[in-house]
Amino acid sequence: MFFAVITLFPEMFEAITAYGISGRATKRQIATVSCINPRDFAEGNYKRVDERPFGGGPGMVMMAEPLAKAIIHAKQLAEQAGCVHAPVVYMSPQGKTLNEHAVQQFVDYDGLIVLCGRYEGVDERLIQHYVDQEWSIGDYVLSGGELPAMVLLDSIIRRLPDAMSDEQSHIQDSFVDGLLDCPQYTKPDHFEGLDVPEVLKSGHHANIEKWRFLQRYQRTLDRRPELVEKVTLTKQQRKWLTFLDDSKN
C-alpha cells in the first residue's frame, strides 16, 4: 500500500518506517511511505507556508497554495505507484473519530494521502477543494497532525496482508469484533503474590477460548459498556454468557 504524507517534519516518520511492525512492512515493501514537505513548494526566499488569519486572532494558518501543490505532487506519486484510489485525508480535531471499522475501510484502499496540519490549521479553501476526508484520533489538542497521522498509518499497516508474522495477532486485537482484549500473561507463573489463571496453563483450548471471551466481554461491559450494545455474538458466545450470569447469582 502506498502512503504519501504531507508534513513540515518528515523526519518524525522514521518512527513508522524504521521501527516495529510498520518498519518491517516498509522494508519488505508491503507498505511504502513517501513524505512530502510543503516548504518545497513554497515561493520566496523564506519558503513561507503560513500567514496570519484574516479577521485577526492568535497563531498562524497554513497557506493553501503550497499545500495544494504538495497534494498534486502526492497524487502524481500515487499514480506512479499504481494506485487507483488514493483519497486525501486531513488529520483534524474537526474530523470523525478514528475507529477499527474506519481502519478496515482504509486497508481496502491501495493508497492514501495524509495531510498534517500545524499552527491554527489550514486554509479552509484547501480543505474544500482538495481534502476528501477529515479524521481525528480524539477530543484533545496536539501541536500538529504528525502524531495522529502516525497513529493512522500504524493502525492500517499492521492490518495489511503479511505485515505481521502471526496473522492471528490482529484478529485477537481489541475492537476487531467490538470487544476489548482479554488479560494477557507470560512467565513467571507467580509474581508478587499474583498467579497466572490455571485455565491458561491447562492446555484445554476450548476452555481457554471460553475464558478469554468471558474476560473480554466482562472487561468491555465494565469499561466501555456502550460498545457491548453494538456487538454481534455467535450462538456459542451467547451460550458462554450464561456462565457469566450464573457466576453473579
UniProtKB/Swiss-Prot annotation:
EC number, as in UniProt: 2.1.1.228
Tell me, which GO biological process terms does this entry list?
Answer: tRNA N1-guanine methylation
Q: Highest taxon of the source?
A: Bacteria
NCBIfam families, per the entry: PRK00026.1, trmD
The molecule here is called tRNA (guanine-N(1)-)-methyltransferase
Could you list this entry's UniProt keywords, alphabetically sorted.
Cytoplasm, Methyltransferase, S-adenosyl-L-methionine, Transferase, tRNA processing
What InterPro entries does the annotation carry?
A: Alpha/beta_knot_MTases (IPR029028), tRNA_m1G_MeTrfase_C_sf (IPR023148), tRNA_m1G_MeTrfase_TrmD (IPR002649), tRNA_m1G_MTases_N (IPR029026), tRNA_MeTrfase_TRMD/TRM10 (IPR016009)
Q: How does it assemble?
A: Homodimer.
